[in-house]
Amino acid sequence: MLTSTLLAAATTPLEWSPTIGIIMVIANVIAITFGRQTIKYPSAEPALPSAKFFGGFGAPALLATTAFGHILGVGIILGLHNLGRF
């Protein structure tokens, strides 16, 4: 009984496309920009190998901003898929 209810609620799978990749990249850029403005200690240890390339971020700040960017991106992509845009 529970299995049939779960199968009835399942949506169609989302196919990857370049549009989805672009949305994820834009979401990560927005998150990194937001993190650059709001993180109190962006250059906390451990440092990254090329600090200038990563905008002066340490490993914790880079991981935090990209994780936040992926959460934003997934929310945008799944929200648009739920609305029928993809």
Curated annotation (Swiss-Prot):
Subcellular location: Cellular thylakoid membrane
Family according to the record: Belongs to the PsaG/PsaK family.
Primary gene name: psaK
Gene Ontology terms: cellular component: photosystem I; plasma membrane-derived thylakoid membrane
UniProt lineage: Bacteria, Bacillati, Cyanobacteriota, Cyanophyceae, Nostocales
Listed SUPFAM superfamilies: Photosystem I reaction center subunit X, PsaK
Residues that span the membrane, as ranges: 14-34, 60-80
Protein name, as recorded: Photosystem I reaction center subunit PsaK
Main location: membrane
Propeptide feature: residues: 1-8
Keywords from the named record: Membrane, Photosynthesis, Photosystem I, Thylakoid, Transmembrane, Transmembrane helix
Membrane topology qualifier: Multi-pass membrane protein
GO BP term, pick one: photosynthesis
